[in-house]
Amino acid sequence: MKQYIKNNIQYPYSLITHGIRISVKTNFLEDQSDEDKNLWVWSYHILIENNRPETVQLIDRYWKITDETGHINEVKGAGVIGQQPIINPKNSFQYSSGTPLSRPSGFMDGAYNMIYEGNKSLKVIIPTFSLDNPLTKIILN
């Protein structure tokens, strides 16, 4: 997967589905992580770019969060960060969120359900991205 740069921000993970580009960058949050409590926390920043000729609206999301042992946690919900953003053609929406793991490494992927032209539906894939602890010597992903 090729890195993507937008406004001088480097996104290591980027994918285009149906003319919608989803780009992701992550950050390990050492200050919120606690190995003694089996807690490792990451933030992720998502950039959604609408390269379609029509306006789209993000309706809901699906995440599959997998830790290094293969344990999977699935998350479904309306919108993102309490919003169901409307994204006009050639415009973008970005947000940041986070996720904890009970292991020091893992990865996430998923999809957004979007609508356009009133009620036509699009499934937009979120690229798989790595959640690796930079303090760990062995990187799995």
Set out the residue ranges of the language-model regions:
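Acidic, contiguous internal or C-terminal segments within carbohydrate-active enzymes
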Residues: 42-47
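Beta-strand signatures of extracellular beta-sandwich domains
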Residues: 62-64
